[in-house]
A protein has these predicted regions:
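A late C-terminal transmembrane helix in Major Facilitator Superfamily
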Residues: 118-152, 159
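Small/hydrophobic positions within alpha-helical transmembrane segments
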Residues: 10, 42, 46, 75, ...
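Multi-pass alpha-helical transporter architecture, strongest
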Residues: 158-175
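Extracytoplasmic gate region of multi-pass secondary transporters
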Residues: 1-52
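C-terminal transmembrane helical hairpin of 12-TM major facilitator-type secondary transporters
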Residues: 62-109
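Helix-to-loop junctions at the C-terminal end of transmembrane segments
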Residues: 50-63, 147
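Juxtamembrane helix-start elements in MFS-like secondary transporters
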Residues: 32-40, 91, 121, 125
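Intracellular helix-loop hinge segments at the cytoplasmic ends of transmembrane helices
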Residues: 24, 107-116
Length: 175
């Protein structure tokens, strides 16, 4: 459970930083302020739709849930890498992948934990949710520090690295 909490911490750190810094980064890559707000709205809509679709797939298709989460985290990491390129088009594609996959995994993850630890759902999800909350709080702080000292591209690559780490950790832990 502690390893799963670390996975959620890394994933939430990267994803929550995206929500915090995406508009200022959109301006930095060439969008005006109004368009940057629309970019955030698009990302949020992608995240909402993706969460609903992922939930329906998890309910109906009965996939390996942790593998599904790992795929979502992996796709999210690609999105974060694209955000780092600093071009308006790749930024938009990265945003769609980042929100659509990289921040849509928590519901499926909680479902997987509840299914895997059916005899102690409350304890198991309490531990893994602790990772989410620690990561969600620490991610924007880390992103801001990296962006301040090394630039926004380095901060997005750091988030990409956290997502990749979460993906690899989850693939190892799920065995």
């Amino acid at each position: 459970l502690v390893a799963l909490a670390a996975v959620t911490g890394m994933g939430a750190a990267a994803a929550n930083a995206m929500g915090t810094f995406v508009t200022i980064s959109a301006v930095d890559v060439g969008y005006d302020e109004a368009a940057a707000g629309l970019v955030l709205a698009l990302g949020s809509a992608c995240g909402l739709i993706s969460r609903l679709v992922a939930g329906a797939v998890a309910d109906r298709a009965r996939p390996d849930l942790l593998r599904m989460v790992a795929i979502m985290l992996g796709l999210g990491s690609v999105g974060f890498g694209l955000l780092a390129l600093g071009h308006p088009v790749t930024f938009l594609v990265g945003l769609i992948l980042g929100f659509g996959a990289g921040w849509a995994w928590p519901g499926v993850f909680n479902y997987a934990v509840a299914a895997r630890f059916a005899d102690r759902v409350a304890t198991a999800t309490s531990v893994t949710q602790t990772g989410v909350y620690v990561g969600a709080a620490a991610g924007p702080l880390l992103f801001g520090l990296v962006a301040e000292h090394f630039g926004a591209s380095a901060a997005w690559l750091t988030s990409c690295g956290m997502m990749i780490t979460a993906t690899v950790m989850l693939l190892v832990v799920r065995r």
